[in-house]
């Protein structure tokens, strides 16, 4: 199993392993976000991925928004280079429940990631 757009095409394999997958058309959300961005978040760390990105995932799954998240990182740009980009901006959220069960979710609400090392500012 590979956490990427290509790897997630085999949804049955992921679901058989107990992963909850995005329930929205990610390609359409990505296109809508690029055309009319609504939410850019500065800081791509664990708290963002576990909370804000997951909230947006739930909103997208319910069809309440058409655009996803853009995440920008200026301090720890390696998060973008080593985590986001190799996995097409997907992440995995693992939640340990009070009863000891584990919930595994592939989060796909982040559709674009940028780091300040790749921004070209006008002179």
Regions found by a protein language model. Give the residues of each.
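Helix-enriched interaction subdomains in cytosolic or periplasmic regions
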Residues: 2-10
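An N-terminal structural lobe/cap that precedes and organizes the functional/catalytic core
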Residues: 9-116
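Conserved small/polar residues in nucleotide/adenosyl-binding loops
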Residues: 117-123
């Amino acid at each position: 199993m590979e956490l990427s757009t290509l790897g997630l095409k085999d949804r049955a394999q992921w679901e058989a392993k107990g992963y909850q997958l995005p329930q929205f058309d990610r390609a359409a959300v990505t296109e809508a976000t690029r055309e009319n961005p609504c939410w850019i978040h500065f800081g791509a760390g664990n708290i963002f991925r576990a909370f804000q990105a997951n909230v947006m995932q739930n909103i997208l799954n319910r069809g309440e928004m058409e655009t996803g998240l853009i995440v920008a990182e200026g301090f720890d740009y390696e998060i973008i280079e080593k985590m986001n980009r190799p996995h097409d901006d997907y992440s995995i959220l693992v939640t340990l429940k009070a009863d000891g069960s584990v919930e595994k979710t592939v989060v796909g609400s982040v559709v674009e990631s940028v780091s300040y090392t790749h921004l070209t500012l006008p002179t």
